[in-house]
């Protein structure tokens, strides 16, 4: 249970980040930038507090933790979960069954696309058998490894066009998945010209041109606690902020 001072600190940190997002968005004429509060390893009590303050977009990195939290917070009907962690293909069925799952941001290859699509179609078949007609496409983002670091997940920049084409043209994928945009994790030691963010913008421009998709319909998820402001400057439509809102992480009970 959080004490009064902890609650005040959380709300103050959240409002500070929210204000900074608004200021930088206005400065560079960016509209409707989503602030995703990354709540991994943090208790659901903290999520409830921010939800009660009107926040809706929350990010989780671990499938089992997301499943547990989504069940515990199932009455929060307007919550929008962003999955931003590594996807194990054998857990795609569990992931796609999460209530109020808004987007999976970390799709990096065709195998994951196909697994997600198959899981969704199986879920749809089960829903139809149970007379549950609450079926809709799942938003997905293609994760691009713009920095080329071996420690990071994501497809190569030159591979993302082919993955988007597969999402849009494969029968199973186009019937169950909605291509929302691109995601990257910038190098924390990036130079001021932000080559990783520029690379993702270049990928977006190429996809728009090659596949005749309107530029403004392709979202960009880039920017975290340490670099969300330059990310917005470069065109991010969604920033993922965790420790700057919730405080440092405790990974001792990581799921």
Swiss-Prot record:
SUPFAM superfamilies: PLP-binding barrel
Coiled-coil region(s): none
One example GO MF annotation: pyridoxal phosphate binding
Keyword Mitochondrion: no
Keywords: Pyridoxal phosphate
Cystines in this chain: none
Transmembrane domains' residue ranges: none
Domain of life where this protein originates: Eukaryota
GO BP annotations, alphabetical order: vitamin B6 metabolic process
One Gene Ontology CC term in the entry: cytoplasm
InterPro entries noted in UniProt: Ala_racemase_N (IPR001608), PLP-binding_barrel (IPR029066), PyrdxlP_homeostasis (IPR011078)
Keyword set includes tRNA processing: no
Positions bearing N6-(pyridoxal phosphate)lysine: 40
PANTHER family: PROLINE SYNTHETASE CO-TRANSCRIBED BACTERIAL HOMOLOG PROTEIN, PYRIDOXAL PHOSPHATE HOMEOSTASIS PROTEIN
Family per record: Belongs to the pyridoxal phosphate-binding protein YggS/PROSC family.
Main function: Pyridoxal 5'-phosphate (PLP)-binding protein, which may be involved in intracellular homeostatic regulation of pyridoxal 5'-phosphate (PLP), the active form of vitamin B6.
Protein name listed in UniProt: Pyridoxal phosphate homeostasis protein
Organism from which the protein derives: Dictyostelium discoideum (Social amoeba)
Organism taxonomic ancestry: Eukaryota, Amoebozoa, Evosea, Eumycetozoa, Dictyostelia
Gene: prosc
């Amino acid at each position: 249970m959080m004490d009064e001072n902890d609650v005040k600190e959380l709300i103050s940190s959240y409002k500070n980040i929210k204000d900074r997002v608004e200021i930088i968005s206005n400065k560079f004429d960016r509209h409707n930038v989503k602030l995703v509060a990354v709540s991994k390893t943090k208790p659901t009590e903290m999520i409830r507090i921010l939800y009660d303050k009107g926040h809706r977009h929350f990010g989780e990195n671990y499938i089992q933790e997301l499943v547990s939290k989504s069940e515990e917070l199932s009455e929060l009907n307007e919550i929008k979960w962003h999955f931003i962690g590594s996807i194990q293909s054998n857990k795609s069925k569990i992931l796609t069954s999460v209530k109020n799952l808004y987007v999976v941001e970390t799709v990096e290859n065709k195998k994951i696309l196909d697994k997600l699509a198959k899981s969704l179609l199986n879920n749809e078949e089960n829903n139809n058998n149970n007379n549950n007609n609450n079926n809709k496409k799942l938003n997905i983002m293609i994760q691009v490894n713009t920095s080329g670091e071996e420690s990071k997940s994501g497809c190569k920049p030159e591979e993302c066009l082919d993955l988007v084409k597969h999402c849009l043209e494969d029968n199973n994928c186009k019937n169950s998945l909605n291509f929302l945009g691109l995601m990257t994790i910038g190098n924390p030691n990036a130079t001021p010209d932000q080559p990783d963010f520029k690379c993702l913008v270049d990928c977006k421009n190429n996809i728009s041109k090659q596949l005749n998709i309107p530029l403004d319909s392709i979202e960009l998820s880039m920017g975290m606690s340490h670099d969300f402001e330059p990310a917005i400057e470069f065109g991010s439509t969604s920033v993922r902020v965790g420790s700057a809102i919730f405080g440092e992480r405790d990974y001792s009970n990581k799921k």
